[in-house]
Amino acid sequence: MALAVPQTAVPRLPRGVRLRRDEARGGWVLLAPERILQPDPVAVEILTRVDGRASLAEIVDSLVAAFSAERARIDADVRSFLDNLAEKGFVEFDR
């Protein structure tokens, strides 16, 4: 179920959730109480921009500039990814 998140919403990692580099696992991990995810490189590009200050629109714009990709496509992918993480409690939105 997709969330109706406005472009001005600011995604953030909730208390107790953090993204960190894990050399033992050979990549990045998203840690939460009693849960762990190993994000792929595309997910890491998104998650490193989720800093609790940048809006959804700013994150999308940053990715468009970094990858010279179509904004509509990146917007849809970022929304889908963050909606999925929000449903699982790994991301929250300040509106």
Go through each PLM region and give its residues:
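Long, charge-rich, low-complexity alpha-helical segments
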Residues: 35-95
